[in-house]
């Protein structure tokens, strides 16, 4: 019993040390956001992966390295017209500052006269939503496997005072090893305390709301 308690305390200390270091790294990047780390002509556009109300996501290839990425292209005029400027700037600033295995990573960002570009790692497995719809339901071990990754990702985010605010199967991507990547930080925000804004996806709201 004593050994088990001591082991648990040691594991918690390791987690706390990791989160403390991660917070320091995040705060540095948060306070020193990267600007224009690439340009459009460095990428070859291959195909459209998805479209949204004010932009689209394309599969691109980096001409120099040959690496594939997902490029989110946001139309500036539509962002302004739909009053999404704050959300867009928040998304970019958060993505360039976070670093965790189960969160999608921003590799490059830049802009031109018409668009904002967020270039993220390409996650080839697609959305969890598609997999879940195909199989009907996950087994209990699968569900626990995925849930553990979501819990760890959100423990990391919440330790940085970040809230995602749009967790759903469509925003969970599955990589080539079968692990999750939380994506779409369009509603994400850094706050201390409560927020009073109703946001997210209506179909996933708690019934009592």
Swiss-Prot record:
A GO molecular function held by the record: protein serine kinase activity
Tissue expression profile of the protein: Testis specific.
Organism of this sequence: Macaca mulatta (Rhesus macaque)
Enzyme class: transferase
Modified residues (Phosphothreonine): 197
Official protein name in the record: cAMP-dependent protein kinase catalytic subunit gamma
Domain Protein kinase: 43-209
Family classification: Belongs to the protein kinase superfamily. AGC Ser/Thr protein kinase family. cAMP subfamily.
Activity modulation: Activated by cAMP.
N-myristoyl glycine lipid sites: 2
Keywords from the UniProt entry: ATP-binding, cAMP, Kinase, Lipoprotein, Myristate, Nucleotide-binding, Phosphoprotein, Serine/threonine-protein kinase, Transferase
UniProt subunit comment: A number of inactive tetrameric holoenzymes are produced by the combination of homo- or heterodimers of the different regulatory subunits associated with two catalytic subunits. cAMP causes the dissociation of the inactive holoenzyme into a dimer of regulatory subunits bound to four cAMP and two free monomeric catalytic subunits.
SMART domains according to UniProt: S_TKc (SM00220)
Binding annotation for ATP: 49-57, 72
Positions of transmembrane segments: none
Protein role: Phosphorylates a large number of substrates in the cytoplasm and the nucleus.
GO terms for biological process, alphabetical: signal transduction
């Amino acid at each position: 019993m004593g050994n088990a308690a001591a082991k648990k305390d040691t594991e918690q200390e390791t987690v706390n040390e990791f989160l403390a270091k991660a917070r320091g790294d995040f705060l540095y990047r948060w306070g020193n956001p990267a600007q224009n780390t690439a340009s459009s002509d460095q990428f070859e556009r291959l195909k459209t992966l998805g479209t949204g109300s004010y932009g689209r996501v394309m599969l691109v290839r980096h001409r120099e390295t040959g690496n594939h990425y997902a490029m989110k292209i946001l139309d500036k005029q539509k962002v302004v017209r739909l009053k999404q400027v704050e959300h867009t700037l928040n998304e970019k600033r958060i993505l360039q500052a976070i670093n965790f295995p189960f969160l999608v990573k921003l590799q490059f960002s830049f802009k031109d006269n018409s668009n904002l570009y967020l270039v993220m790692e390409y996650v080839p497995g697609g959305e969890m939503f598609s997999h879940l719809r195909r199989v009907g339901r996950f087994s209990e071990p699968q569900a626990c496997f995925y849930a553990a990754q979501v819990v760890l990702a959100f423990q990391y985010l919440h330790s940085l005072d970040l809230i995602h605010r749009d967790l759903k199967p469509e925003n969970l991507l599955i990589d080539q090893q079968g692990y999750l990547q939380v994506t779409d930080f369009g509603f994400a925000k850094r706050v201390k305390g409560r927020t009073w804004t109703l946001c997210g996806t209506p179909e996933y709201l708690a019934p009592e709301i």
